[in-house]
Regions:
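A conserved regulatory-domain signal marking ACT and ACT-like small-molecule sensing domains
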Residues: 1-87
Length: 87
């Protein structure tokens, strides 16, 4: 049985190229380090000068707002937006 109480999607989107995806992913992962969670899956797409990075995480849903805030702070220097949704 998982110690996590829920799952959520974190979506990060903004301007960028394929070479920016890993840098943005690394920044997001650094922001996630203080939290007790597990990244189930990560997918990215780069199209038309934009990137979308999706992270499927297991976490405590009560912490999702703080997780989103910290990730937003980590990627705002790349002019990225962040959204989250409990699934």
């Amino acid at each position: 049985m998982s110690k996590f109480k829920g799952r959520a999607l974190l979506l990060i989107s903004g301007p960028g190229s394929e070479s920016d995806v890993q840098v943005i992913r690394d920044s997001a992962n650094t922001a996630l380090e203080p939290f007790t969670l597990h990244v189930q899956d990560a997918q990215s797409i780069c199209m038309g000068g934009r990137i979308i990075l999706a992270l499927d995480i297991e976490c405590d849903p009560a912490h999702l707002s703080a997780i989103e805030t910290d990730v937003r702070g980590a990627v705002e220097k790349f002019r990225c937006d962040v959204a989250s949704e409990i699934i």
